[in-house]
A protein has these predicted regions:
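C-terminal motif of bacterial Sec signal peptides marking the signal peptidase cleavage site
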Residues: 15-17
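Bacterial signal peptide processing site
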Residues: 19-21
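Surface-exposed beta-loop interaction hotspot
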Residues: 162-212
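Acidic, serine/threonine-rich low-complexity disordered tracts
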Residues: 25-169, 207-329
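Bacterial N-terminal signal peptides that target proteins for export
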Residues: 1-8
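Residue-level signal for mature regions of secreted extracellular proteins and peptides
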Residues: 11-12
């Protein structure tokens, strides 16, 4: 079994702007208590094309205009999808620039940052997906951890899921009395997918999704949808069909996700960076790409760096700049 290419290991070690310096943490305590086991070895290493594209020491940031449904009304908001590679310690599934083999696992991290207003108060939603770049499961980029944090004026909520074989570990910390703080296991049949990870997997960055065909099986809905519905986390039967379609005069790969009475249609670039161009959902959600940039964003935290936001479609105040193309060349 080939190990991850050396160049990607080197770059993962450099992406430390969001890390705290210091020694590696011990593999004990709440961070790894009860985590499901993960395969010792990958089935295949990350491909050379993926490694070349994601070894430039930068993150990919895409800004979107979003309409989301909350409290029965549509809200205008902004969404940023941030993709970056980084190393994790497989004993705890936390980022660690200093961890060495055999505990070091390179992942592609997606941070999905959603902001919108509900009347007098704002909502801030951050979903993080951590997916190894080497293939450990049937489907590439199977996640090892998914977390959601929601902040609004009533309070804040954390929801984490750690997928494994036959089960996923779940932790919820909520200001709601009926939810409180709890840990439990969620049954997940073999081959279960996670809706939050589809924003990585459907990009087909290292080979076709579902072998290039349609998919049917078990899926855990997005943590944000679970949060809004105040329902327990559970795997549901779902389908994903694919086709070629037209969007703004250009050909796209179109994926349609269906489960229960819910439908979500996602359009993806068929080549190049394979960006998520947008999606529409049966609950009225409507998301459109504005602009994409590759930046070492962790270095752009000084006064005056606010102007860099326009490079990925957001103005200084969080709005898309006038005339910004929705799907840039």
């Amino acid at each position: 079994m080939r190990s991850m290419p050396v160049v990607l290991w080197a770059v993962l070690g450099l992406l430390g702007g969001c890390a705290r310096p210091g020694p590696s943490p011990a593999a004990s305590g709440p961070a790894n208590a009860g985590l499901p086991p993960w395969p010792d070895r990958p089935r295949a290493s990350a491909g050379e094309a993926f490694t070349r594209a994601w070894s430039d020491g930068r993150a990919e940031l895409s800004g979107y205009r979003a309409r989301v449904n909350r409290y029965g009304e549509m809200r205008e908001g902004e969404l940023v999808l941030i993709y970056v590679t980084e190393p994790m310690d497989r004993r705890t599934w936390v980022k660690d620039d200093a961890v060495a083999a055999p505990h070091r696992v390179g992942v592609l991290k997606l941070n999905a940052s959603l902001r919108f207003q509900t009347g007098v108060y704002p909502y801030s939603v951050l979903t993080s997906v951590f997916a190894p770049v080497d293939r450990y499961r049937d489907e590439a980029f199977a996640p090892v951890k998914i977390t959601l944090s929601v902040q609004e004026w009533c309070g804040h909520v954390f929801h984490g899921v750690w997928p494994g074989d036959g089960r996923a570990a779940e932790q919820v910390m909520s200001y709601f009395a009926e939810e409180g703080e709890r840990r439990r296991d969620v049954a997940t049949p073999g081959g279960t997918l996670y809706e939050d990870a589809l924003l990585i997997q459907l990009r087909e960055l290292d080979g076709p999704f579902a072998g290039g065909g349609d998919w049917r099986g078990s899926l855990v809905p997005s943590l944000w949808s679970i949060r809004r519905a105040h329902r327990p986390t559970a795997a549901v039967e779902a389908t994903i069909t694919r086709s070629r379609a037209q969007r703004d005069g250009a050909e796209v790969h179109r994926f349609v996700l269906r489960y229960g009475g819910y439908t979500r249609t996602l359009d993806v670039e068929p080549g190049g960076a394979r960006r998520i161009l947008g999606w529409q959902a049966s609950d009225g959600e409507d998301v459109h790409l504005v602009r994409t940039a590759r930046l070492p964003y962790w270095q752009l935290n000084h006064n005056g760096d606010e102007g860099q936001r326009a490079l990925f479609g957001l103005g200084d105040g969080g709005e898309a700049p006038d005339g910004a193309p929705r799907t840039p060349p």
